[in-house]
Every structure is written in structure tokens, then in C-alpha cells.
Swiss-Prot record:
GO terms for molecular function: 3-methyl-2-oxobutanoate hydroxymethyltransferase activity; magnesium ion binding. 3-methyl-2-oxobutanoate binds at residues 43-44, 82, 111. NCBIfam families: panB (TIGR00222), PRK00311.1 (NF001452). Binds 1 Mg(2+) ion per subunit. Homodecamer; pentamer of dimers. This is 3-methyl-2-oxobutanoate hydroxymethyltransferase. HAMAP family: PanB. Mg(2+) binds at residues 43, 82, 113. Belongs to the PanB family. It is found in: Cytoplasm.
Amino acid sequence: MITVNTLQKMKAAGEKIAMLTAYESSFAALMDDAGVEMLLVGDSLGMAVQGRKSTLPVSLRDMCYHTECVARGAKNAMIVSDLPFGAYQQSKEQAFAAAAELMAAGAHMVKLEGGVWMAETTEFLQMRGIPVCAHIGLTPQSVFAFGGYKVQGRGGKAQALLNDAKAHDDAGAAVVLMECVLAELAKKVTETVSCPTIGIGAGADCDGQVLVMHDMLGIFPGKTAKFVKNFMQGHDSVQAAVRAYVAEVKAKTFPAAEHIFAD
């Protein structure tokens, strides 16, 4: 079974980590069998599964239900579950109560969004036995504060993002996840922090990559984000597409230049 220690060893060895979102047992089992090391039960289910316009309405009850489903299908992969909006920002104690429910539902790690100001919560949780994935850069739960889905780290804000990563690393975060971050900045963060980094739209130099399952399978028609690749193209089954994703992450051929944000 994949553990925090496994991820640390992979970072040290330079072996890339493959992560995908999963929301139910059958896809979790398929991804697990295909060699995906980490399954993210993301609040992205609000849009991908529930048909909502953002992640904000997703409840802790929703997250626990889908975590239970994924846990029934996964045998080897590490399950990371999102703390949903409103379930952890009020206090460290509120965060622990919500995280404990997710862990009881089958999660092995919880993910929270936020920079330096959330590092205290990261420390509070990890000291009480709950591994934390700290999500920095573009944080979808704060999309209205950002004014939309924008690339992070431009306009003199690189140091602030680096400070966010350092704060969570110092607080004991098991993983730092960066979303929509300039590739060179993400590389610097990866070289600076001791914990593994996972990128989504954060270049090829992170310790691992993650995509939303529906995006990498080309389920949603129309325009997709720059960092998305449809792995169903050229493959005749979902399992073949997932295996291709894992292989490209491991070979460092995904993300390619066309998927990367640069100045």
C-alpha cells in the first residue's frame, strides 16, 4: 500500500507520482489496478458529478460518501480527500472534526486549500495523526476572490507563493499540491520543500501530476484548460487511457510544453 513514506522515497529517487481524481468504487479499482499511486476524492465532484458551477456547494456529507465509495474500490493507492468549503476555515478544531470524519470514511490524507494562513491548521492536523496535502496557487474554493481561474505567480507574487509552500512544509505537510502555477516557480518550490509536490498546470518538474478524471478521459466537450490532455484519444478503453497517463507521467513526457504556463 502507498504511504507517506512511499511518496517521500519516490521524491528522493526521482520517480514521478501519478494521481487522478476518483469519485466511486469502480473507477477507483480500475485506476488502482493501472498503477495510479494517489486517488484524489476531490470537491471537483461538485462540477464533475453533481453538475454544479463551482466546488463551493459540496458538503462534508458528500465528501464522506464519495470517500467511502472510493475506499471500497482501492486496494493499494493512497486516498486523499478534500476538506470542503466551510468545513475547516473557521478554526483548527473545526478542521480536525471534519478531517476525522473523512479519515473514518476511508481517507489516508486530507487536502486543504490556502497559503501561509492555513499552515497552523496543517500543523494542528498532522500533530494529531492526520496527514495533510496543502493546496496552493489557484485554489478553486477562493475562485471568486481571485476573480476567476488565473495563472498564479505572476506580477511579483512568486515569493508569496514560495512562502506559502515553505510554511506548509515547515508545518509538516505530507504533500504540497500546486495548481495553475508558472512552471519555473513550481520547479523552485519542488527543489525547496522537503515534501513531495504534485502539480496540475504547474509544469513538468513537480514530483507528481494530477488531473481530473473527466478531463483526462475527454468526457466534457468543448474548450478545456491548457494543462489538460485527452488520454482517450488513441486508446480503446478507459483502462488503456489511464495506463497511458501513468506511463507518460513516469516517463516525464506529460505534461509537455503545450500544457505548461510560462512567463
